[in-house]
Swiss-Prot record:
Gene3D superfamilies: Hypothetical protein af1432. GO terms for molecular function: dGTPase activity. It comes from Bordetella pertussis (strain Tohama I / ATCC BAA-589 / NCTC 13251). Residues 13-42 are annotated as: Disordered. CDD domains: HDc. This is Deoxyguanosinetriphosphate triphosphohydrolase-like protein. It comes from the Bacteria. Pfam families: HD, HD_assoc. SMART domains: HDc. Residues 73-208 form the HD domain.
């Protein structure tokens, strides 16, 4: 938004933005793209990857086949990318880089959402401790660095440093040392690019608000319960006053739309204020500064209240816990079966060394969709 209230239609990059012409490069040297920027190329490679397509059949909260309207990792990633791009334009940073990070942030997620990730991590640590655990941010980086097989001259997607860095939201010191330059910020305690910060916050905006929508559609949470949540209650009351005859379903959609807008407007204003205070003149200045993207204290409290409500009432609902328990059993039994007899694996996933074998099994399971994991489990454990 300009000072006169007009909407920014073209994004002229600010001095603190990541400039695609000054990227820190790719792992494997390539000629520059002819009709795209480097960050556009990254975004396009992510969209065309096999891992991105598989997100359509991976869980957000509900198992993929539970309902046609529930969000999957793919629809969630698209929603994150839309929010992230809006934020990037408002702050005059690279929309293409922000979008690429947003689209790639869940590429390493297992089937069955966080339940699958937690169980796969437990299996790796208990049954193959020498191989290290499993963490979906690291797996997302592994997907784009190694596991995708689309190009003749290299494994992975060969993305720019800035995109790879943005994908890696969390990392232990041990893993950071193994990753080289892309892990350095976890050792020297610096920040990622502003584009990465925005993509991370866009993820939070998307999943909190859209999980409200899915939770209501499923019947696991109710409008009455949500009246306890300040940001929802306030906007729902405003909608009811303005549109007293509106059907509950549409009133809920209007409420969620307003909640998202509140978060985006606050995030934009707060981030711009921090940028003015710290006056970064370059992308490197952003890295040396404290986090520049963020919510105001008041809106952060409201967002945290909503997050806690969802944790207590949706993610811990007995029906979700039942799905979680089934998912954990499927992941654990698949891992145990493959580790006990690697001949059950497709040939491409068989390895000579035990440590390598465990990692290959985790790659195989992490790459499964919900329904593929269910079918694979049935093939191994059911007669007929």
């Amino acid at each position: 938004m300009n000072k006169d209230g007009t909407v920014v239609l073209m994004n002229e990059l600010a001095s603190y933005a990541s400039d695609p012409s000054k990227t820190r490069g790719r792992r494997h040297s390539e000629p520059p793209p002819e009709n795209r920027t480097e960050f556009q190329r990254d975004r396009d490679r992510i969209i065309h990857s096999n891992a991105f397509r598989r997100l359509e059949y991976k869980t957000q909260v509900f198992v993929n086949h539970e309902g046609d309207l529930f969000r999957t990792r793919l629809t969630h990633s698209l929603e994150v990318a839309q929010i992230a791009r809006t934020l990037a334009r408002s702050l005059r940073v690279s929309e293409d880089l922000t979008e690429a990070i947003a689209l790639a942030h869940d590429l390493g997620h297992t089937p069955f959402g966080h339940a699958g990730q937690d169980e796969l991590n437990a299996c790796m640590r208990e049954l193959a401790p020498q191989a290290g655990g499993f963490e979906h941010n690291l797996q997302s980086l592994r997907v784009v660095d190694e596991l995708e097989e689309r190009y003749a001259e290299f494994n992975g997607l060969n993305l720019c440093f800035e995109t790879r860095e943005g994908i890696l939201k969390h990392c232990s010191a041990t893993h950071a040392r193994q990753l080289g330059a892309v892990g350095e910020r976890f050792l020297d305690r610096t920040q990622p690019s502003l584009e990465a910060q925005l993509a991370n916050l866009a993820d939070e905006v998307a999943y909190n608000n859209h999980d409200v929508d899915d939770g209501l559609r499923s019947g696991l949470i109710t409008l009455e319960q949500l009246q306890e949540v300040g940001i929802f209650a306030r906007h729902y009351a405003e909608v009811a006053r303005r549109y007293p005859q509106l059907a509950p379903r549409r009133a809920t959609s209007e409420t969620i739309r307003r909640m998202i807008n509140t978060l985006i407007v606050d995030l934009t204003a707060t981030s711009l204020a921090r940028i003015r205070d710290h006056a970064p003149a370059s992308a490197d200045d952003v890295r040396r500064a404290p986090p520049l993207a963020g919510f105001s204290a008041a809106v952060r409290r409201e967002a945290d209240e909503l997050k806690k409500f969802l944790f207590d009432n949706l993610y811990r609902h007995y029906r979700v816990v039942r799905m979680t328990t089934k998912a954990q059993r499927i992941v654990r039994e698949l891992f145990q079966a493959f580790l006990g007899d690697p001949r059950l694996l497709p040939p491409d996933y068989r390895r000579e060394q035990p440590q390598d074998q465990a990692r290959a099994i985790s790659d195989y399971i992490a790459g499964m969709t919900d329904r593929y994991a269910i079918r694979e489990h049935r093939r191994l454990f059911e007669m007929g």
